[in-house]
């Protein structure tokens, strides 16, 4: 999915969070080959430079320095009014940003800071949803924009 800008055949881009250099060999839109695709578009791309086991759900292909790869983020957090439990420092959770879902821990509550076990790809103002899968009631703890 093209979420911003343009992607062209033979572009040299990077696969994040790994930072692998990739070459766009071909682009398909609705089963038809195209030479470029502009936001917003759903595309299929063939890349050179990355093996299938190096690519995972939520990985991002982008020009260099457009996205951030972070192991720690700060959020403008709004707790869900339906989530009744308290949150504490060092408590574990899952964080969803785009198609990525990564394990994290709370570093601080006010302001809300999270630290990740594995790096996450994000941009400023992306929405992060915080989940507690082991919760017996509601599993969505809240959300906020990445600062």
Regions found by a protein language model. Give the residues of each.
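C-terminal effector/interaction modules appended to NTPase cores
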Residues: 1-147
